Amino acid sequence: MAGSNCGCGSSCKCGDSCSCEKNYNKECDNCSCGSNCSCGSSCNC
């Protein structure tokens, strides 16, 4: 478990790796603080 608030389309914390829900095997790595990350999208802090 990378983070509690890490879900597909949910807000991810900086440096947290978020696993996409649904039927996607992609992850959201290095999400920006307070930003929303889409499935398979990589955001920089």
UniProtKB/Swiss-Prot annotation:
GO terms for cellular component: cytosolic ribosome
Molecular function GO labels: copper ion binding
Keyword Metal-binding attached: yes
Tissue distribution: Widely expressed at low levels.
Highest classification ranks of the organism: Eukaryota, Viridiplantae, Streptophyta, Embryophyta, Tracheophyta
Official protein name in the record: Metallothionein-like protein 1C
An annotated GO BP: response to copper ion
Organism (species): Arabidopsis thaliana
Metal-binding in keyword set: yes
Gene: MT1C
Similarity section: Belongs to the metallothionein superfamily. Type 15 family.
UniProt function note: Metallothioneins have a high content of cysteine residues that bind various heavy metals. Confers tolerance to cadmium (Cd) and plays a role in Cd and zinc (Zn) homeostasis.
Domain of life: Eukaryota
Keyword vocabulary terms for this entry: Metal-binding, Metal-thiolate cluster
